[in-house]
């Protein structure tokens, strides 16, 4: 069931780039993670066809991972990895899926994600992080 929007979330302005930027600013400038999560949720619901969707899912995954909600984080990173194959956020999302699997104690699954990043995106920072995470 969809959760009702909290009053903390700014209403959608009708401009996807403005709404996305406001949500990102809540994270980067204001460090207000409690408000950023509903802001990204609102963005995803308001602009289902936006080119900024993968970024919004990635940010939500990152915020939820930081709060220790690995299940929710995993869902957002999987969305980026599976639905947005051309997104520049995809290698990082796959890497984060590996990090979550490792934290869940599934080293084999973690290494599969890490190897996927290294193989598909060899010259990225995500690949370097994956290499380190595998102990290489």
Task: List the model feature ranges, each with a label.
Residues 1-29, 34-35:
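Acidic, proline-/serine-/threonine-rich low-complexity intrinsically disordered segments
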Residues 26-27, 64, 101:
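Residue at a conserved register position within TPR or TPR-like alpha-solenoid repeats
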């Amino acid at each position: 069931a969809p959760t009702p929007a909290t009053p903390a979330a700014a209403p959608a302005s009708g401009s996807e780039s403005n709404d996305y930027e406001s949500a990102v600013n809540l994270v980067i400038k204001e460090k207000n993670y409690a408000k950023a999560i509903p802001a990204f949720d609102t963005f995803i619901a308001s602009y289902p066809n936006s080119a900024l969707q993968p970024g919004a899912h990635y940010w939500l995954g990152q915020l939820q991972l930081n709060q220790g909600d690995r299940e929710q984080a995993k869902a957002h990173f999987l969305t980026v990895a599976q639905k947005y194959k051309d997104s520049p956020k995809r290698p990082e999302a796959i890497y984060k899926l590996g990090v979550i699997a490792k934290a869940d104690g599934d080293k084999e699954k973690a290494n599969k994600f890490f190897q996927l990043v290294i193989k598909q995106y060899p010259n990225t920072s995500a690949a370097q992080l994956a290499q380190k995470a595998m102990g290489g």
